[in-house]
Amino acid sequence: MRKILRLFPMMLLCLCVLTACSSDDGDNNGDSNGKNGVYVINGHKFVDLGLPSGLLWAECNIGASEPEEAGYSYRWGEVEADIVNEGYKFKDGNTYTKYTKKDAKTTLEPEDDAATVLWGKNCHIPTKKEFEELVKCCKWKFADEMGDATVTGPNGNHIFLPKITFGLMYRTSSFDTTYPTDECAYSLQLWRENTTVVAGTSRTVSMPVRPVAKR
């Protein structure tokens, strides 16, 4: 009887350790499961495309409930959607007040990143470099000359990028330091079929956002 009593606390300790390890491995801090290459982070689905960086791309744009929906559009650095009749957040008259050559800020800070603010701290708007990886490492299939795109990664998983009214254009979180003024930030652009580039566009143009996240 004494031997059984001495063994019982040890059995409980082992059980607790095994349970804790199982919990951490199974739900990745409660954010994802990875089944079929799909991870759920902060309630949103992300796809593992097998990219060298390991970056996960969201299934949908911000404001969309299906991959085929364009969702909401945002001016660069703003976290409220589709503002067209109000002044740009970072402009006073003709002068840009943040993300300039003077302050040397080249990437959106978390409070100015719509993906981080709206979807949580593990998510962000893709940088120029991250979009360039998507362009370089994936196969792109377009519905038409300026149309929707199915983007298939090295591992065979894919995401769908719907176009907006004037073509396929998506925001990055990167400021365009090469432009002569502080006017531009980088965006993904489809100029014509099979020619997708990451180039500078006006910060005040509204575009959809496709969040990314790291595992």
Language model segments and positions:
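C-terminal motif of bacterial Sec signal peptides marking the signal peptidase cleavage site
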Residues: 16-20
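Bacterial N-terminal signal peptides that target proteins for export
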Residues: 1-9
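Alpha-helical transmembrane segments
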Residues: 11-15
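C-terminal, surface-exposed recognition/capping segments
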Residues: 25, 29-45, 50-215
